[in-house]
């Protein structure tokens, strides 16, 4: 959308730089201005629609982070690539409500998924006896949101985390 707006501004700038001898009544200029204003209105509508969906999703799951699956089953490295390509992140719940939102996705699909636990995490939800480095260097969440050590080679549900700075 920004590209379209910039293109319109560029055309307007070129028109203004070339003078008005080909458009003495200003019809072309007015047409360009009208088109640019239409694009701005459309952009505002799209932004509003996006924010409405974002607010509804975050209200519905109690978290401002969204956890989304493509229903694929992959290992940790494939998950990392998929989330990066989608401009998301490997889930890293920092609060109980975020972990609950993440667990809701897992429960709905009846699958486990990887997550990342930071060294300075204030919130953790390790299952009894965990973390267990002998089980593996990665972490997975079960359908209840409890965290377990696991191998990074396990094939688990692909879930990516998305959050927005507004």
Curated annotation (Swiss-Prot):
Glycosylated residues (UniProt): 61, 122
Disulfides per UniProt: 83-160, 138-152
GO cellular component, one term: extracellular region
Similarity comment: Belongs to the alpha-type phospholipase A2 inhibitor family.
Location(s) in or outside the cell: Secreted
UniProt-recorded name of the protein: Phospholipase A2 inhibitor clone 06/08
The entry's keywords: Calcium, Disulfide bond, Glycoprotein, Lectin, Phospholipase A2 inhibitor, Secreted, Signal
A Pfam family per the record: Lectin_C
Distribution of this protein across tissues and organs: Expressed by the liver.
Described function: This phospholipase A2 inhibitor binds directly phospholipase A2 in the presence or absence of calcium.
Region forming the signal peptide: 1-19
Subunit structure: Homotrimer; non-covalently linked.
Gene Ontology terms for molecular function: carbohydrate binding; phospholipase A2 inhibitor activity
Domain C-type lectin residue range list: 46-161
């Amino acid at each position: 959308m920004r590209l379209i707006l910039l293109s319109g501004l560029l055309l307007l700038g070129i028109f203004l730089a070339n003078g008005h001898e080909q458009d003495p009544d200003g019809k072309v200029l007015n047409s360009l201005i009208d088109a640019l204003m239409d694009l701005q209105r459309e952009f505002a509508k799209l932004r509003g629609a996006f924010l409405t969906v974002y607010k509804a999703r975050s209200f519905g799951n109690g978290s401002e982070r969204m956890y989304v699956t493509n229903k694929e089953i992959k290992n940790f490295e494939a998950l990392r690539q998929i989330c990066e390509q989608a401009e998301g992140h490997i889930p890293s719940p920092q609060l109980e409500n975020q972990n609950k939102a993440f667990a809701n996705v897992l429960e709905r699909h009846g699958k486990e998924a990887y997550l990342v636990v930071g060294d300075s995490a204030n919130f953790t939800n390790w299952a009894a006896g965990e973390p267990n480095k002998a089980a593996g260097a990665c972490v997975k969440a079960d359908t209840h949101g409890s965290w377990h050590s696991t191998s990074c080679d396990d094939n688990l549900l692909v879930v990516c985390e998305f959050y927005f700075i507004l």
